[in-house]
Structures are given as C-alpha cells and as structure tokens.
Amino acid sequence: DTMKWIGKMHGVPEISKMATDLADILRSSISTKEFVSLYEELELLMRYISIQRIRFPGRFTYTVTGCEPYLDCKIPKLILQPLVENAILHGLNDRENGNISVTVGETERGELYISVSDDGCGLPEDMLRAFQSQGPGSDGHLGLYNVNVILKKYYGADYGLRFANGAECGAVVTAVLPMQRREPTC
C-alpha cells in the first residue's frame, strides 16, 4: 500500500497501478488455496499483463478467447502467469507490436486446455524436440518446468504442457488438464 500511495502523491498513476496489481498477485501466491477457478486465474493474469504493459508500453497486445464456458473450472493456481511471462520474454524478444493470445477450450477427450501463443520466431527445432519428448528442463525455463511438474503431480503423466510452433510463426504452449468444475457455494 505504501508504494501505491507514493505513486498517487507524486502523480504517477502507473506506480500506484503496478503496486496494487503486484500486491494482489503476491496475496494469491501466499494463499493456502492450491486450486482456483479459471475466472480467478484469469483475473490474476490480467493483473500480471497490466504490469507488463506498463513495463513494455505499446510493445504487445493480448487477447483471451474461448474462456466463457470454462470460467468455473478448477485449476491449480498461478499456472498461467509463467506461460505468458515466457511468451513475453522469449516470444516477443525485443520486438515491437507483438501479440500474445490465450485460448481456452476442450479437447476431443473432454479435457480442458489453455493455450498461450505468441507471434515471435517460435521455438528452435532442437528445443522444440527436447520439450516435446521430455518437457522443459529446470535450466533456463524454470517457470515452464514448474507448471509442467505441478500439472503432472496433480493429474498424472497424461497431463501437463504441450509445445508446438504456430502454423505461420510463434510458439504455442498448451496446458492440458482434466475438466473439473468447481462445486457451487451457497
């Protein structure tokens, strides 16, 4: 809150906004809840993206599509931010006017998928093959590694991250997990 009020006092609304968003992300990260609804996860993701858009003004746009039918799905908390962070840091790679897209849907087997894609240069072929066969290593891709480990820990070896290059350009990282709806609360 101190940073937020310093930003307000000095007429720098970006500092105030970043402090508020960061505080919300930190509160969620220290919460004992292991699972959240997709809606809650997307709210935190929007806060993270807001911070990054202040950090990299005008450098990228983002879209989120397909999420409406799945907003009540239960997912491990804080699994989307590392995927988007990876797309921003590696996919945009000092480019101007990049795009990051988050797409939510259902596989043919009834599983939930959440894809994060960018329009950068894609994954080098050797890295793509390594990621597809054994997943990301903890050396240099710690966020992707952690998300993959979390998904496999909770759901088993059939679930986790999938890696591909886009049809025209960019990388696509997809989290695949069982479709689990949250129980309604009264």
State where each predicted segment sits.
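Short, charged, solvent-exposed linker or helix-capping segments at domain edges/interfaces
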Residues: 126, 184-186
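Two-component histidine kinase transmitter core
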Residues: 178-182
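Two-component histidine phosphotransfer core
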Residues: 1-164, 170-174
